[in-house]
Amino acid sequence: MKFAVIGNPISHSLSPVMHRANFNSLGLDDTYEALNIPIEDFHLIKEIISKKELDGFNITIPHKERIIPYLDYVDEQAINAGAVNTVLIKDGKWIGYNTDGIGYVKGLHSVYPDLENAYILILGAGGASKGIAYELAKFVKPKLTVANRTMARFESWNLNINQISLADAEKYLAEFDIVINTTPAGMAGNNESIINLKHLSPNTLMSDIVYIPYKTPILEEAERKGNHIYNGLDMFVYQGAESFKIWTNKDADINSMKTAVLQQLKGE
């Protein structure tokens, strides 16, 4: 079977390394490549994918929303998130999914098993936040809060959870067991501070969905304060495993995928 990841730029993507490691571990001769498709060429997506004879593909920035009009069917999770990161091509039909939310929550559950009783704060109200919130709401609905700089961003949300401003989030920070940053603040080249951690409880798990850099500024600050931290590496691995399951109906080798990504990050 043939797979790929599409984006622009895409040369930095670790998806090919991760998926190929999984294929090798499972003894599969499947292929996975990175395809750079600029925005101005995206209208040719059907033609490009057809020529490659792909069985499925991942979509990353900046095409997660742009792909939706080209799909024949969109899964409920992807509709809720307003973004697609996985496409299955079956009998000529393109089916869109979003595995980011379930990928993050599966990883989080492995390091924080008592999610059901956790008070959780999500920073940011973009597509990534929405996907994670919808998935977390299955476990922690009464105790889930999302904070954003502007409240207007919540107008497209159809989820009954607590919605507060970032200013209020700073005030009540000590009340949360887990704080998750889903904003671009702290990504490579972005040193913006999203929130003041002055009131962060020492028992709070501080998380970020970014894994490059391995420790974002908000994670470094929390670690200096003595908090446990959790980055986005597991989310990346688990969302990839979920994509593989959608494409093949097989379980991925999580360990081989994570090891391959870690080796790449360390330059091995």
From Swiss-Prot:
Chain residues that bind NADP(+): 76, 124-128, 148-153, 209, 232
Active-site residues, record numbering mapped to chain: 64 (proton acceptor)
MF terms per GO, please?
NADP binding; shikimate 3-dehydrogenase (NADP+) activity
List the SUPFAM superfamilies.
Aminoacid dehydrogenase-like, N-terminal domain, NAD(P)-binding Rossmann-fold domains
**What are the record keywords, sorted?**
Amino-acid biosynthesis, Aromatic amino acid biosynthesis, NADP, Oxidoreductase
Q: Which Gene3D superfamilies match?
A: Leucine Dehydrogenase, chain A, domain 1, NAD(P)-binding Rossmann-like Domain
Q: In which pathway does it act?
A: Metabolic intermediate biosynthesis; chorismate biosynthesis; chorismate from D-erythrose 4-phosphate and phosphoenolpyruvate: step 4/7
This enzyme catalyses: shikimate + NADP(+) = 3-dehydroshikimate + NADPH + H(+)
Enzyme Commission number, as recorded = 1.1.1.25
Q: Carries keyword NADP?
A: yes
A Pfam cross-reference name:
Shikimate_DH
Locate the residues binding shikimate: 13-15, 60, 85, 100, 211
The Gene Ontology CC terms held by the record are: cytosol
Which BP terms does GO give this entry? Answer: amino acid biosynthetic process; aromatic amino acid family biosynthetic process; chorismate biosynthetic process; shikimate metabolic process
Q: What does this protein do?
A: Involved in the biosynthesis of the chorismate, which leads to the biosynthesis of aromatic amino acids. Catalyzes the reversible NADPH linked reduction of 3-dehydroshikimate (DHSA) to yield shikimate (SA).
- NCBIfam families xref list: aroE
Q: How does it assemble?
A: Homodimer.
- Family per similarity comment: Belongs to the shikimate dehydrogenase family.
The protein in question is named Shikimate dehydrogenase (NADP(+))
